[in-house]
Structures are given as C-alpha cells and as structure tokens.
C-alpha cells in the first residue's frame, strides 16, 4: 500500500474517533488530510511528482502543496475516472472547512459539517483504493 494511502487511513480513523468525542474542529482537519493524502497517492500512481508543478515560490514544487493537489484533482481529466468532478470539488470544500476549523476560532463547526467531512474523505479514499487495486491486482 502506498505510504500516503496508509497515512490517509490513519487520519480517517483519527477523524472518526474525534467525531465520536464531539471534537468537530479536529474532525474536519483530520478528514481533510485523509482525503488529501489519498489524492497524493492517486497523483503519484500516475507518475506525477510535486516538481511537475509550479509551487508557491514560482519554482518547481519540492513537496505536494494543497493548492497544487486540489487544483490538479479538479482539473486533470485523467483523474475523472477515479474522482468525478463533483467528488473532486468536494476536496476544495473540505479544504475550506479545514481552514475554518483551524484558523477561524470565532466560527462554529457543526456536527453535520464534521460528519460530512468524514463521509467525503471515506468516499475519496474508497475511490482511490478501488482504482489502485484495479491497476495493481
């Protein structure tokens, strides 16, 4: 199993535990990163590397950046067989919720937002895993 996918599973389990404890901010953050890391595994399965993209510095990226991952997942037509556009767009929604959760202390994160974040991460991971299994039976 790809190292990023292993991490995605660990983070999703953390998100579920946090959700059960009513810790909605942390749930949203962990769920986003679970989805994010599964997308990294998907991109790398296509042979893509961070250096294929321009990073925030204006030079080839030295690591996967959130802006790169969320943009590529939504715009790369090769990935549409794995993550449909509506699912891919949900990664952007999750990112926005993670920013709210981590940096906007005055905003409340609802149980529904946290639950939805976990469900979306689970769906993205399942799609990526299904694709990777089909490619490497």
Task: For each feature predicted by the language model, list its residue ranges.
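Terminal alpha-helical segments
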Residues: 1-137
């Amino acid at each position: 199993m790809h190292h990023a996918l292993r991490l995605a599973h660990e983070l999703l389990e953390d998100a579920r535990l946090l959700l059960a404890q009513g810790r909605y901010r942390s749930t949203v953050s962990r769920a986003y990163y679970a989805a994010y890391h599964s997308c990294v595994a998907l991109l790398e399965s296509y042979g893509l590397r961070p250096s294929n993209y321009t990073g925030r510095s204006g030079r080839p990226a030295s690591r996967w950046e959130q802006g790169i991952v969320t943009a590529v997942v939504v715009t790369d037509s090769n990935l549409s067989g794995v993550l449909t556009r509506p699912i891919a767009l949900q990664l952007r929604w999750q990112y926005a919720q993670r920013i709210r959760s981590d940096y906007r202390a005055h905003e409340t994160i609802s149980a529904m937002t946290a639950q939805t974040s976990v469900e979306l991460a689970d769906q993205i991971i399942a799609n990526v895993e299904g694709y990777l299994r089909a490619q490497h039976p």
